[in-house]
Each structure stands twice: as structure tokens, then as C-alpha cells.
Amino acid sequence: MEKDLMITELLNAWEETYKKGQLTFWVFLALKEENKCVEEIKEFVETMSEGFMSCEEQSLYRNLRKFQHLGIVAYDSKRVSKGPDRKYYYLTDIGKALFQRFVERNILIFTKESIINLLTK
């Protein structure tokens, strides 16, 4: 039982570190096909990750501001029926190219048959 507890604790720590590094990936994936407001990005991340990833709206706003400053994300403002205009974020051409290269270098490697075989043994 002690061994299982240790594995669970180590796994939780590993996943927390892993999740922190994945937020950018999930935000870019959310914006890959269409413009989204922060609430839609949050919902996309939680739904597509099957609940594995969750993020606070404040974290998303902070990251989106950083990405905007770097020129990889921009936004259009749209009027909504109530309240202030809503910002709909999208990847710029540089952001799209950056995301594509990241996927090619870091994600598609996991689709290689040799890697799949190791993961599923």
C-alpha cells in the first residue's frame, strides 16, 4: 500500500509540472481553427483534454497578454448584447507558424510506430 501511495504522490507531482508546461499548447490549439473569447478557450481546453487540463480565466488573460506582446496572438473586439465589447483572440501568421513547428518537433513524434509500440507495451 505504501508503494501505491508513493507512486500516486510522484505521479501527481509530475502531472502538475507537466500541466504547467502544457497551457500554451492548449491555448494555441484552441485558437488554431477559429477566434475564441477567453470563456470559449477555457471550455475548449477542459473539454478537449477530457478534464485533465483546467485553467483559470486570469491565467488565460495573463498568457494572452504575453502572447499579444510577442506578436503571436491578436484579437478583434465584438459587441455583445450586454456589457463591454468581448475580445476574440486568434493566432497571427507568426503564431500559426510557431505552433506548426512546435507540433512537428514535439507532438508528431508520438505518432511514430516505434514510439506507439513502446507506449502501449
Regions found by a protein language model. Give the residues of each.
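Beta-hairpin "wing" of winged helix-turn-helix
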Residues: Q68-P84
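Short capping segments at the starts of secondary-structure elements
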Residues: A30-E40
